[in-house]
């Protein structure tokens, strides 16, 4: 009984160790604005720059997405206090 509970604990420990890096790699998308599918935008970064954004890149908006979306990086707002 003790060895089976140790084995089960070890399995959960391994799963946690495997999933933690994947979850840590999730990037902050709060500063990204999707503008369209990358297949229809020739140069995502240049298109975003021409649209007054800092730049852009093609990303999979959802982990299980097949298609990539062009997302532009929003300029930080500067507020004077």
Curated annotation (Swiss-Prot):
Its main location: secreted. Keywords: Antimicrobial, Disulfide bond, Fungicide, Plant defense, Secreted, Signal. Disulfide bonds join 38-58, 44-70, 48-72. The keyword Secreted applies. GO terms for cellular component: extracellular region. Residues 1-26 form the signal peptide. It comes from the Eukaryota. One of its GO terms (biological process) is defense response to fungus. It is found in: Secreted. Belongs to the DEFL family. This is Putative defensin-like protein 31. It comes from Arabidopsis thaliana.
């Amino acid at each position: 009984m003790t060895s089976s509970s140790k084995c089960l604990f070890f399995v959960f420990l391994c799963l946690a160790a495997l999933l933690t890096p994947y979850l840590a790699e999730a990037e902050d998308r709060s500063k990204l604005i999707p503008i369209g599918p990358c297949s229809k935008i020739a140069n995502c970064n240049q298109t975003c720059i021409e649209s007054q954004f800092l730049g852009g890149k093609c990303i999979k908006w959802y982990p299980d997405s097949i298609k990539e979306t062009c997302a532009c990086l929003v300029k930080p707002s500067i507020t004077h206090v």
